């Protein structure tokens, strides 16, 4: 019996610079946590997954969160099936930017593509050094309940948390993302992706 071809899906990860996007993808695809921060311009990975008995080839697109790459980033949205919108648990500003920047960009470029809100660096809530740093900056970690409310308000499929450092929740994020991507038909996606190719 011939093996059927895997279903191909494209996942794009967006969010502020240094919020943990590249680490998340590295841990999921390569199995290691990068120890040095190097700003991403564009990185692509491919992962073969099995979800609900279906073989899925997931193309993973990492994007730059920094402002200097804003003219390039829209290209990465073309033909996306699912978007992960990331923020760092230790950066309330990065969650604020989800509502004020990232969702606006997604709704403009890919209005029909589902997205999941992902709180990254969840391990820092119990890290003594991080706790002290947040106290020194007079800031609080983002609470799960806060992020849940944001997810509901912006129309995210769901809210999830993970830690790339410990690996907690990483596989769950990609399993949920793959499931959501499988609900998108390519014909719908092609209509919305025409907007994704416009560069001004």
UniProtKB/Swiss-Prot annotation:
Taxonomic lineage of the native organism: Eukaryota, Fungi, Dikarya, Ascomycota, Taphrinomycotina
Entry-annotated residues carrying Cysteine methyl ester: 197
PROSITE patterns per the UniProt record, alphabetical: RHO (PS51420)
Disulfide-linked positions: none
Name of the molecule in the record: GTP-binding protein rho2
Domain of life: Eukaryota
Record's bilayer topology term: Lipid-anchor
Lipid attachment, kind S-geranylgeranyl cysteine: 197
Pfam families: Ras (PF00071)
Family: Belongs to the small GTPase superfamily. Rho family.
Protein location: Cell membrane
Propeptide: 198-200
Keyword vocabulary terms for this entry: Cell membrane, GTP-binding, Lipoprotein, Membrane, Methylation, Nucleotide-binding, Prenylation
The encoding gene: rho2
Gene Ontology MF annotations: GTP binding; GTPase activity; protein kinase binding; protein serine/threonine kinase activator activity
GO biological process: actin filament organization; establishment or maintenance of actin cytoskeleton polarity; negative regulation of glucose mediated signaling pathway; positive regulation of cell integrity MAPK cascade; regulation of actin cytoskeleton organization; regulation of fungal-type cell wall (1->3)-alpha-glucan biosynthetic process; signal transduction; small GTPase-mediated signal transduction
Binding site for GTP: 15-22, 62-66, 120-123
Subunit structure: Interacts with pck2.
CC per GO annotation: cell division site; cytosol; new growing cell tip; nucleus; old growing cell tip; plasma membrane
NCBIfam families: small_GTP (TIGR00231)
Cross-referenced SUPFAM superfamilies: P-loop containing nucleoside triphosphate hydrolases
Motif (Effector region): 37-45
Main localisation: membrane
Function per UniProt: Involved in cell morphogenesis, the maintenance of growth direction, control of polarity and of cell wall integrity. Regulates the synthesis of alpha-D-glucan through activation of pck2.
